[in-house]
């Protein structure tokens, strides 16, 4: 089977969880099916308007696909920003369309108390309505979609990485630290984490906080760290490759992901897979695999004092931490093993292809 895959970022150069997810998924599926990935060639910052970037990106993807001169059996689109190309190519090539909804911009903006971009609302609806089958990574995401779409939704989580290679920790990192990583955007909840850490450090005086990633909120977080007198206790690192992330995970006291909106939680999955004591927020895709006091720690980061108390108690209880770390690792292998994920995708692709009236 030949799959035409559309994505806003290339799996070989991931810049977010979507790219990391694709990188892993394609590596597991490639021995069994042929996947050709098409991505935009332009850069968002070079466009005056977001709509112009999306329009040009989709036009470019369509042009590249049509000039590729290869027969495909199915289109798999990732993210609503590929919706115009996906919908057009479905009609032009007469192919069934599967779409993975990695998150909803409408829900993300609601959490941040901002108005979603009208163009994104349109592309979300276009992709959901055009797809013959929808894939989401968590039951949380399934609940987020309209009930009318539920009949064509399949929940398939992101596969575990199964990678163990680590590097050597820099001498400057030879200290006790909490670790969090991802995009520096409001919905990741890092402003709340800084507030919690400001309290926690008073009880854990040798503890540091390491934040790795990139995004528009970086300067805001740096100012917050200074306001809470944390400049010498918080270290900001750039976007890291997976090997460096595993290295830091292997040396941290715990990994903390306080997101206010999280469709799946790939970083938390990665942390648990590495056997790290993992703290997540109460909502989102975390809930499919993070069970409080069993496989992970679930905290309400809006209650700053209570969250600090909770983290402090687990940092001091080594035996309980050891039990949770091992259970978390086993949970990820049980629910997200690549064999399970690969089988689910192959079966879904086959079903979509066989059910299509146009193949």
From Swiss-Prot:
Pfam families per UniProt:
Glyco_transf_4, Glycos_transf_1
Q: Report the EC number(s), separated by commas if there are several.
A: 2.4.-.-
Keywords for this entry? Glycosyltransferase, Transferase
GO terms (molecular function) for this protein are: glycosyltransferase activity
According to the record, the segments passing through the membrane are none
UniProt keyword Transferase, yes or no: yes
| GO BP, sorted A to Z | biosynthetic process
Q: Which family does it belong to?
A: Belongs to the glycosyltransferase group 1 family. Glycosyltransferase 4 subfamily.
Q: What is this protein called?
A: Uncharacterized glycosyltransferase YqgM
